């Protein structure tokens, strides 16, 4: 009997070995399945909770309250409740009925890449947004969703997306480099004709994409932005914005919201020009985005990126349209709201530096008005601005004065004239001939005897031009001083008045000099000992008292 059960000692050893191998194989297979198990993010979901964008409320135990508080501190919204709202909840159609009558030509003509950059995003909230994109977007349009995990990725989330959502391309940053850098990384991988940037806590609504694409198909230098509604941080209720608004900014770069101009209001629901992107959700032609250089690589973490891209788009030949027939709901997180706060009120030093970069590159001489309201930012150090300035010159972008006067006249009427200094206006007289004045005759600058009227008055303009009527003093490539018709573009040879030496300086360190022999003007290397380079500007004392005599010294072209 014993031999039948175990056989020889050799047979017994073989039996034990086979048993161990099978056991180990089963154990490894089981543990591997455990480690790669797909988390069911619908485990806690309650059917119809939050359906149609309605408020969601649940009774909570003490344990639930503690858990909810911890998650709220981490994610800045009610993540506990989000776990109980279905990932594929439906929302109402919030569009104007007129939108339903519009036929769009975008389907089957372009492809779209959605770019989402996240930092420690709550998985359920992110997935709900991704599912809304997939269910509310035509498969003919949606080429891919590029999801960039900016440091500390959630492995369960990554695994779920990998197995359940093959349309999503996931990129993992080894360390957090900020949302701006993550967005640039995602855009670099995207291959669709049009890029649509979203954030990780939003939901799109029915018919949201074609209205954003249509204006871009008509003009690929158009950037479009939907009407951004709010999703409650506490109840996840979808709250429709009652009336479209115009986003603007003041001299502190704080957001202000203005009513639409009458023409835009009467044309609703047609798209209308917007002076600035809110920046959380927008669409842009991929080639045009990279033609503009994307975002300034010197912008770190977050903040200032929406303003930078807005000014870049407008000043470099594009336009921004708000699209009422496209609606997207956003959860407004506290840190994102802080990132868009005026830099003088912003607690983040990096955000302050970001805004300073934008100001120094794009606001031209008007940056001095910004510094009057934000003096502590004047002396902040920032990385080299050579690249964004070179890009601006290469693209032949327009001046901020053009933006102020042409893009946002309504905004100008509200605030862009507020706080502006009156620039010096007066006669310009050479020290060597104090009874003579600088003037223009026959299109040429001349020195002639002064009149008692204002006929010889000159203005040192906000664009650092010496202006007389509609003519400006300019310098040609041979350093000859001439008079040309003033333009709204930035001068290649800006002028400033050196109060200490009473000289007008342009074209580097060259000074306006009277040629006594020819009774004309030349441009020579500045020399404080040369009396012919000294000029009396009759209103310069008032200018000095306003602490802005160096206005053109600090302008960087």
Curated annotation (Swiss-Prot):
Transmembrane segments: 5-27
An example molecular function term from Gene Ontology annotations: carbohydrate binding
A GO cellular-component term linked to this record: Golgi membrane
Domain Ricin B-type lectin residues, every copy: 456-557
CDD domains: beta-trefoil_Ricin_Pgant8-like, pp-GalNAc-T
Annotated spans, Catalytic subdomain B: 271-333
Cytoplasmic membrane side: 1-4
Protein's membrane topology: Single-pass type II membrane protein
Keywords associated with the record: Disulfide bond, Glycoprotein, Golgi apparatus, Lectin, Membrane, Signal-anchor, Transmembrane, Transmembrane helix
Domain of life: Eukaryota
Gene Ontology biological process terms from the UniProt entry: protein O-linked glycosylation
Cell compartment(s), UniProt: Golgi apparatus membrane
Function field: Probable inactive glycosyltransferase.
Notes on the domains: There are two conserved domains in the glycosyltransferase region: the N-terminal domain (domain A, also called GT1 motif), which is probably involved in manganese coordination and substrate binding and the C-terminal domain (domain B, also called Gal/GalNAc-T motif), which is probably involved in catalytic reaction and UDP-Gal binding.
Listed PANTHER family: N-ACETYLGALACTOSAMINYLTRANSFERASE (PTHR11675), N-ACETYLGALACTOSAMINYLTRANSFERASE 4-RELATED (PTHR11675:SF134)
Identification of the protein by name: Putative inactive polypeptide N-acetylgalactosaminyltransferase 11
């Amino acid at each position: 009997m014993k031999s039948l059960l175990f056989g020889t000692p050799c047979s017994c050893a073989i039996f034990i070995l086979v048993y161990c191998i099978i056991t180990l194989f089963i154990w490894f297979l089981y543990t591997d399945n455990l480690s790669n198990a797909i988390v069911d993010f619908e485990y806690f979901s309650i059917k119809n909770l939050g359906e149609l964008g309605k408020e969601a409320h649940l009774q909570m135990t003490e344990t639930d309250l503690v858990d909810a508080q911890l998650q709220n501190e981490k994610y800045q919204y009610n993540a506990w409740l989000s776990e109980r709202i279905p990932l594929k909840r439906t929302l109402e159609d919030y569009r104007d009925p007129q939108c339903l009558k519009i036929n769009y030509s975008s389907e089957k003509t372009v492809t779209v890449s959605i770019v989402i950059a996240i930092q420690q995003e709550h998985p359920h909230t992110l997935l709900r947004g991704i599912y809304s994109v997939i269910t509310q977007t035509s498969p003919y349009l949606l080429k891919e969703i590029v999801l960039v995990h900016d440091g500390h990725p959630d492995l369960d989330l990554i695994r779920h997306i990998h197995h359940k959502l093959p349309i999503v391309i996931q990129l993992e940053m080894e360390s957090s480099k900020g949302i701006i850098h993550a967005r640039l990384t995602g855009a670099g991988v995207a291959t669709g004709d049009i890029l649509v940037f979203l954030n990780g806590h939003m939901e799109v609504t029915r018919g949201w994409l074609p209205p954003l694409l249509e204006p871009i198909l008509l003009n690929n230098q158009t950037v479009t932005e939907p009407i951004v509604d709010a999703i409650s941080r506490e109840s996840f209720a979808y709250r429709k914005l009652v009336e479209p608004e115009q986003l603007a900014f003041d001299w502190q770069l704080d957001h202000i919201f203005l009513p639409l101009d009458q023409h835009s209001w009467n044309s609703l629901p047609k798209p209308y020009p917007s002076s600035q992107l809110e920046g959380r959700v927008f669409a842009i032609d991929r080639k045009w985005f990279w033609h503009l250089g994307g975002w300034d690589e010197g912008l770190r973490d977050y903040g200032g990126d929406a303003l930078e891209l807005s000014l870049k788009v407008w000043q470099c030949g594009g336009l921004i349209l708000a699209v009422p027939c496209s609606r997207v709901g956003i959860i407004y997180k506290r840190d994102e709201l802080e990132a868009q706060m005026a830099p003088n009120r912003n607690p983040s030093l990096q955000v302050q530096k970001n805004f300073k970069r934008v100001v120094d590159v794009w606001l031209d001489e008007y940056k001095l008005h910004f510094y009057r309201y934000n003096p502590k930012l004047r002396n902040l150090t920032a990385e080299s601005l050579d690249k964004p300035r070179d890009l601006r010159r290469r693209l032949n972008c327009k001046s901020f004065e053009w933006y102020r006067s042409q893009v946002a006249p309504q905004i100008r009427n509200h605030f862009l004239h507020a706080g502006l200094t009156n620039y010096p206006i007066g006669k310009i007289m050479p020290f060597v001939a104090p009874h003579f004045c600088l003037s223009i005759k026959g299109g040429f600058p001349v020195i002639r005897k002064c009149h008692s009227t204002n006929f010889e008055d000159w203005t040192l303009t906000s664009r650092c031009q010496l202006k007389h009527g509609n003519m400006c003093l300019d310098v040609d490539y041979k350093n000859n001083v001439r008079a040309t018709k003033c333009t709204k573009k930035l001068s290649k040879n800006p002028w400033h008045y050196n109060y200490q030496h009473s000289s007008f300086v342009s074209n580097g360190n060259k000074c306006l000099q009277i040629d006594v022999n020819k009774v004309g003007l030349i441009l020579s290397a500045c020399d404080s000992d040369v009396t012919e380079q000294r000029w009396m500007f009759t209103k310069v004392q008032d200018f000095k008292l306003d602490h802005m005599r160096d206005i053109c010294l600090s302008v960087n072209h």
